[in-house]
Regions:
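Iron-sulfur-associated redox domains of electron-transfer enzymes in respiratory
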Residues: 25-184
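Iron-sulfur cluster-binding cysteine motifs and their immediate structural context
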Residues: 1-10, 14-29
Length: 184
């Protein structure tokens, strides 16, 4: 039933998850390339939750006077995409968030940066990357994207309800880590 539903909706113009759409359109398994990496600097590795690969890629972009967009947990526990232009600003993008982030006006900002000749790195879920590409309407040679593995990320609204529960039970929440290395 599920496959029939997706095939029917694709024919009717379904534009949902790009991974599901691509899989159903192909209808045959394809070989994909996958890469694994770990940052060489132990300090970066210790501050990162997924090996520090994003930091290494971002460093290469910053070395070209480029711009890096990624997801930050704001002080109010909202998860948002932000623009960073140096390593100091980038530090808040480290660590996993496990929530669908608010892209805000970052697509417009990316377009502006690209039109100014900047190298741009944008990290997000596959649907966010697909949304960025559709927004831009054409490929850009200086745009690099990192699609994080999506496993059905949770919504901010649901997370806010959890935070309300946690605040009532434990009091004020100062920091939050989804994958803490404190006890490793």
């Amino acid at each position: 039933f599920m496959q029939i539903f997706f095939i029917r909706t694709i024919k009717e113009g379904y534009t949902g998850c790009p991974v599901i759409v691509r899989f159903i359109q192909l209808q045959t398994p394809t070989t994909q390339k996958a890469y694994a990496a770990v940052h060489k600097d132990y300090q970066v590795l210790a501050k990162s939750t997924s090996g520090g690969a994003f930091t290494a890629i971002a460093d290469a972009v910053f070395a070209q006077d480029g711009i890096v967009y990624g997801v930050a947990m704001m002080d109010n526990m909202q998860v948002k995409h932000i623009r960073t232009s140096n390593k100091e600003e980038f530090a808040v993008l480290r660590s996993s968030k496990y929530l669908q982030s608010d892209t805000g006006n970052t697509y417009q900002m990316v377009e502006q940066d690209l039109k100014q000749g900047k190298t741009v790195l944008y990290s997000g879920t596959p649907c966010q990357i697909d949304g960025l590409r559709h927004f831009l309407g054409k490929p850009y040679e200086r745009l690099y994207t990192v699609d994080i593995v999506c496993h059905g990320v949770g919504s901010q609204a649901y997370f806010d309800k959890y935070l309300d529960f946690a605040r009532k039970r434990y009091g004020n929440i100062k920091t939050l880590r989804f994958r803490s290395k404190e006890y490793v």
